[in-house]
Structure formats: structure tokens, C-alpha cells
Amino acid sequence: MELKKMNGIAVLLTAALLCSCSTKSDKPKITQNSPVPQNVLTASQDSKQTQQTVKNEEYTPLNYDEQKAVWISYIDLAGMLDDSESAFRENISKAFENVSDLGCNTVYVHVRAFGDAYYVSQYFAPSKYIPAEDGTLRYDPLKIMTDEAHKYGLSFHAWLNPLRCDTQVYMEKMQGTQIYEWYSQPGKYPEYVSKPDNSDYYWLNPAYPEVRKLIADGAAELAENYDIDGVHIDDYFYPTTEKSFDMQAFTAAQTADDLSQWRMDNCSEMVHDIYEAVKSVDKRLLFGVSPQGNMDNNYTQMYADVKKWCSEEGYLDYIAPQIYFGYENSVCPFSETLKNWENIVICKNVKLVCGLGVYKLEREDEFINDMGIIARQIGDTEADENCSGFALYSYQSLFTKTDERFLEERKEISAQLK
């Protein structure tokens, strides 16, 4: 995502997050004994689902026919995390209350952004943003987040960046993990972890089955150990179009003769493996991908074969393209772009969720000049029978802006939802 490429500013958001929350509502939290909210997909609604082997038998996933989602990024979380478990619980609970009060029912929350973990993991090192001592977490943020989200009736999708790792400084702190072994022994594991030219960040290479297995195992670990409702990845597939990034791996793949197709096949294998890993734990859990809204970019820059994933079984439950464009955009006008995505979602088991860019309200003229444009776009998705919801990027843009313009925009969004 465009805005998610920001780094290093996360710790500055704490004060903004704590002071910008909406007025506390009198709406009661949902408890274990509360009735299931309307339009919820549960096991009882699908006799096939009730016959599945479920490894996390104590939890029934909470998902909605129509997703009304908000992305909560690692940048947002860094401003909420605290040395105190109780303080973090209060901060994240307030965030979920804000999302619920707005009229939304789902959150995509970052739990792995840089080859790290916001939870207890046997595969990944703790995130640099999490309070820890000698690599041991002081508390488990993900356990707290799922508990608090469900109190407000929010479906919780664990958001991963499966391939992106970190800078050299933080890669050196991942000792004891598989990623560190690959990173520290490039002679033994050539290009398992690669760094594009003119970039400080390392990336996992999906060309290798061992890499794809690690990513899939990490998704299964989340599904089995935590009360999540889905797994979600975004548009960070290949970080570069440079041939040098993975030339050794490509050369070794003797059956491949087209670099672009080979890379797309690698990503498709990875997406399929994550899907299968999640479903192996509980077929009621959802798996979704949020690719770039510009269809061509997925093929020419990211090597993401979105048409394949939306037309064949075994890849997705939903796709949430980032249609962060205005109605008058010269390259990807909103209505036309949404229609293009509708046309490729032909697999009956894949739903379309429209990603909307709230952050554009302070970045582009059409969004700045057209008051209520996000609310209007939400209305368009709700009126479109081919859409199964929307997702708003991001929490920061929705709730940490205190100027009159953003307050009015949020008011119009809430009015549209309610």
C-alpha cells in the first residue's frame, strides 16, 4: 500500500491516538453470552462447515456477509503499545470501540510486518515495537487484541506481510529464527533472503519451497493458537522488477523461460499455500488478499496473478483491491476500476471487498475538494450487488485527525453506515 511504505514514524503517534478517540458510546460490549450479531456467518449456517476437523475447538469464527473493515497498521499499533499490559489493553479497546461506533464490523490488524511477530511464535522473532525482555514478550498483544475486538462484535483478520523483512540492523536481532539462518548464510542459502538495489530492506524469496512453507506454517500457527477470524495479506509481493533480485534462483529453475510468469507462479504458489494452511486448521476461517487497485500494476510490478486467484478455487475467500482513486482519476477512475474488478471475480467462492483510501482526503485535490467522497464511495459499494463490502485505509486517517474537515468526513461516513 502506498502509505504503508512509511517507516520510522510510528512512535510519534501515541499522543494523537489517545487524544483523538470518538466520544464513548453507551453501547454495551458483546460478551460470551451475547447473541450473535446480524448477518454473521457461523458454522450452523453451513452444514458442510460443521463437519470439519477444527483444531481450535473452543472458538467459533466471527465473519460477516458484508465486510465493513478498517485496516490497523503496525504504525497505528506502535502508538498504542505500552510497557504496561493494562495500558495497551485500554488503548486497543478504545480503538476497537471507535471502529465499532463508526459502524464497521471487521478489522485487519498487522501482526507481522517485517518478518516479525506481534504474538508468541515459534517461527518469528518478536516485533521491535513490542515490549520484550531478552526476546520474551512481557504480554501477548495478539491475545489481547482478539479478546477486545470480539467484545465489540468485530471480526479480527490477522494481517501479514509474508515476504517483507527488515533492515540489516534488525535482521541481526533475529537470531534463532529460520529467517536469520537464511540471511546469515547466503552461500548455503543463495537468494532465500534478498535485498533489492537501492533499498535498505531484505525480502524473502517466494521461489523456494522452504520459504513458502515457513510462510504457510506461520499462518497455520496463527489460526491454531489464536481466536482469529481470518488471515489477510496486502500488495507487498515482489519488491522490485530488477532481474538481479533472484537471477540465481530463476536460472536454477530450468523449466522456466519467462521471468515474469515464473515470478507470478511463485506468488500464486505462496497464496495457495497460505490458503491451504489456514483451511487445514479451520475451513470456516477466511483468507483474503489486498492487491493494488491498478490492475496492470499487479502484473507489471508486483507479479500478482489476481485474475487467476479470483477465477479458480483454492486461492482466496475474498479479494480487497486498493481502489484508492477518485471518480475523476485520469488513469483509474473509481467507478470504472471497481467494475473491472467485478469482471474478474468469477469464482463463486470469492467475494469482492472494495478498499477505499481515507488518507487521500489530505493528499489529492478531488478528495480535498469533494466533501463526503469516501461516504459516497461506500454508498456505491453498498448499492452494488457484486460487492460484499469495503475496507477503509486506515485507522490513523479515520481517528487521529482532529481538524474540522476530518471530523466532518468521519461524520458523513458514520451517517452512511448507520
Q: What are the residue ranges of the model-derived segments?
A:
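Active-site-adjacent "subsite" loops/lids of carbohydrate-active enzymes
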Residues: 60-89, 157-158, 163-221, 225
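Polysaccharide-binding and catalytic clefts of secreted carbohydrate-active enzymes
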Residues: 98, 185-312, 324-325
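Catalytic domains of carbohydrate-active enzymes, especially glycoside hydrolases
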Residues: 90-117, 225-230, 314-318, 387
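Aromatic- and acidic-residue-enriched carbohydrate-binding clefts of CAZyme catalytic domains
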Residues: 65, 115-142, 169-205, 239-261
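Substrate-binding cleft of secreted/luminal carbohydrate-active enzymes
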Residues: 313-333, 340-418
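The substrate-binding groove and active-site-proximal loops of carbohydrate-active enzymes
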Residues: 75-86, 124-138, 198-213, 256-266, ...
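Aromatic-lined substrate-binding rim segments of carbohydrate-active enzymes
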Residues: 113-161, 255-281, 334
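C-terminal motif of bacterial Sec signal peptides marking the signal peptidase cleavage site
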Residues: 18-20
